[in-house]
Amino acid sequence: MDFEDDYVHSTCRGAYQDFNGMDRDYGPGSYGGLDRDYGHGSYGGQRSMDSYLNQSYGMDNHSGGGGGSRFGPYESYDSRSSLGGRDLYRSGYGFNEPEQTRFGGSYGGRFESSYRNSLDSFGGRNQGGSSWEAPYSRSKLRPGFMEDRGRENYSSYSSFSSPHMKPAPVGSRGRGTPAYPESTFGSRSYDAFGGPSTGRGRGRGHMGDFGSFHRPGIIVDYQNKPANVTIATARGIKRKMMQIFIKPGGAFIKKPKLAKPMDKMNLSKSPTKTDPKNEEEEKRRIEARREKQRRRREKNSEKYGDGYRMAFTCSFCKFRTFEEKDIELHLESSSHQETLDHIQKQTKFDKVVMEFLHECMVNKFKKASIRKQQTLNHPEAYKIIEKDIMEGVTADDHMMKVETVHCSACSVYIPALHSSVQLHLKSPDHSKGKQAYKEQIKRESVLTATSILNNPIVKARYERFVKGENPFEIQDHPQDQQIEGDEEDEEKIDEPIEEEEEEEEEEEEEGEEAGSVEEEGDVEGEEGTAEAAAAGEADAVGEAEGAGEAEEAEEEEEEEGTQEFAAQACATEQCEHRQM
């Protein structure tokens, strides 16, 4: 029996030496050449391999163990030993461990009680080998990184809770990441002991007496560094403190931001009323903008012909046609009335204002009809346009004029064939585009209505309309002079004031952050502007902005109409399409 024991002992010792490359005694009280006896809370006293094997195989009983005496001190069986990634005989605690004094003074025997099993399950101890091999040098960890009192101040987890509930007690902020001196905020990728963290650890309570046990790492006494503890605690609660003050005031922070550009505009434009130099510069700028608008219209006329301005449009419904009957039916249709009702609901305008807006569209249709009639009275101009359409086209180009159908919702041209139109009507793309386009029309109709009411010319007409007069009445002037005067008024409404447009676009971009709250505020402000116009009060800045907004809406309509006009080719309603 002695021979067999000696053989087993020598074989085991040789295997250990080959595995570690050096002669080590893996007794429960030793690690890396340092002899420890955790059972008695002191160093020294190298234990023999005989005593270790006898203890491991249950051949020798020690006091204080009970059922767990067959396992060595601090080597009670748990899920750690069944997982790979570490030495199965390596002690679970490394250098500089305070457990030898804390647990040695708190518990008796060899610490084989249920507390040992409970404590061993904490902090990712059973997460495999990743929690036993530190990938980073301990010297790089922030001082006090693993100190227990830093966790005591803001951890609400109990010391004997489930391992799935308690986070790994690493990192000063409880996020499972160490703070390295190389980076201000530390890395967010790895756990201090390798592998992922077991939890975020956002608790803010106090730990129990046993929940603040040490983990392997550098131990620093925080009693000499109270400032660090305060900083760590303040760091943990800083975000919640910020949210308390930011969230309630979030809606109020944007309003001053939106008001600042208006204040700047008022301050910059108020001197123009008294400074003649600024007035001259403003006039030159306006003339330059008008000239640019004329060049733009000439360019569109050269590209699409003059007929694109002959279309009948409804600015609110984005309806466009070349037939008088169609526009007449639209202005009396339920869809047009629904758009007006939506505008009234969003803007809170009274019935008189809505009637005035409807009359504006009717008057626009009448003026377009007069312009078109005058154009048709000069057939030579129409022939020139028709000739220019096919100019340069030869038989080798394989091009011809065909009739098409334009879908504004999908922005596509469809061949004027029954099968093609029906196929597009039943397509899912058209169904989705139709709903989206309808919502877009409703949103833009509100902006168009408020922009029109801000125009100074429209304000004057509204004042006459409220008094019971007809602001669109055609007087007994010669027809040519009346049309010229109306066109001048329309040009004033349509003239772009591009600098104001840019400022308005910036305000709109900022206003989108505020959402519907800002939109309602703008609408109410514009309603007040309309009422002020009825009383004869007009603000210079508001007039300039209104003119720019009205012109912008009209220009968008004209740009949209150019594509449709190109498809219909003036009165013939035809466009060019390539046939290969």
Swiss-Prot record:
Span(s) of short sequence motif Bipartite nuclear localization signal: 238-260
Q: Where is this cross-link: Glycyl lysine isopeptide (Lys-Gly) (interchain with G-Cter in SUMO2)?
A: K140, K240, K247, K254, K264, K401, K459, K467
* Location of the protein in the cell: Nucleus matrix
> Per the record, which residues fall in region Disordered?
156-196, 256-302, 470-580
Q: Which residues carry this modification: Phosphoserine?
A: S48, S56, S63, S69, S81, S82, S91, S106, S114, S118, S121, S137, S212, S270
Q: Where is this region: Mediates transcriptional activation?
A: 1-124
Per UniProt, the ranges with Basic and acidic residues bias are 272-290
Protein's GO biological process? mRNA processing; positive regulation of DNA-templated transcription; regulation of DNA-templated transcription elongation; regulation of RNA splicing; RNA splicing
Q: Zinc finger (C2H2 AKAP95-type) residue ranges? A: 314-336, 407-430
- MF term (GO), any: zinc ion binding
Q: Which residues carry this modification: N6-acetyllysine?
A: K247
Q: Give the protein family.
A: Belongs to the AKAP95 family.
Function in brief: Core component of the DBIRD complex, a multiprotein complex that acts at the interface between core mRNP particles and RNA polymerase II (RNAPII) and integrates transcript elongation with the regulation of alternative splicing: the DBIRD complex affects local transcript elongation rates and alternative splicing of a large set of exons embedded in (A + T)-rich DNA regions. May also play a role in neuronal differentiation. Able to bind DNA and activate expression in vitro.
Protein name, as recorded: DBIRD complex subunit ZNF326
User: What organism does the record attribute this protein to?
Assistant: Mus musculus
The gene coding this protein = Znf326
